[in-house]
C-alpha cells in the first residue's frame, strides 16, 4: 500500500508519485464500488478541484474528496480499461508553479469496446503537501467522446 505524504513538508514530486501509485492500486483493486477511496484521499486537499473538459463524458468541475470519488465512478463507467502506459514529469512544481505531467494512455471504452491511445497533459497544483487543483488537457476530446458513445 502506498504511503500518503507527511504534510506540508512533502515535496510535490513525492506527492505526485505517491498519488499515481495509490491511484493504480485503487484501480487494480476494482476502483469505485469495489475499492476504498481512503488510500487516495490523503494525497488530495479536502478542497481539491478537478477541472475536466466539458466535451468529455465525465466533463465538468469536481470538488472535494466526494467530488473525486464521483469523478472516478463516472470515469470508470466510461472506460473498461484505462492504462497509464508512460508518464513523464515535465515540471515538478518545486519552484512554486504547478507540476506538469505528460501521461500516455491506452484505454478501452466500455460502451463500444473500441480502444484509443492518447496523451493527457495535466497541470497539478500542490499546496501544503496535498494536491489542490488538477487541470487535465486531452489532445483530442472529440476523439475520446466519439469513441465512448454508441452510434
Language model features: what each stretch is:
Residues 1-151:
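C-terminal and inter-domain tail/linker signature
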Amino acid at each position: 500500500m502506498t504511503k500518503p505524504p507527511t504534510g506540508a513538508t512533502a515535496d510535490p514530486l513525492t506527492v505526485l508519485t505517491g498519488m499515481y501509485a495509490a491511484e493504480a492500486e485503487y484501480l487494480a483493486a476494482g476502483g469505485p464500488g469495489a475499492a476504498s477511496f481512503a488510500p487516495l484521499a490523503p494525497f488530495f486537499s479536502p478542497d481539491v478541484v478537478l477541472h475536466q473538459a466539458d466535451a468529455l463524458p465525465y466533463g465538468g468541475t469536481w470538488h472535494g474528496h466526494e467530488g473525486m470519488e464521483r469523478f472516478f465512478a463516472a470515469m470508470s463507467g466510461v472506460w473498461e480499461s484505462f492504462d497509464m502506459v508512460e508518464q513523464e514529469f515535465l515540471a515538478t512544481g518545486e519552484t512554486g508553479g504547478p507540476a506538469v505531467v505528460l501521461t500516455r494512455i491506452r484505454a478501452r471504452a466500455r460502451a463500444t469496446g473500441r480502444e484509443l491511445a492518447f496523451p493527457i497533459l495535466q497541470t497539478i497544483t500542490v499546496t501544503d503537501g496535498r494536491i489542490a487543483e488538477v487541470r487535465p488537457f486531452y489532445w483530442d476530446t472529440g476523439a475520446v467522446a466519439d469513441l465512448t458513445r454508441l452510434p
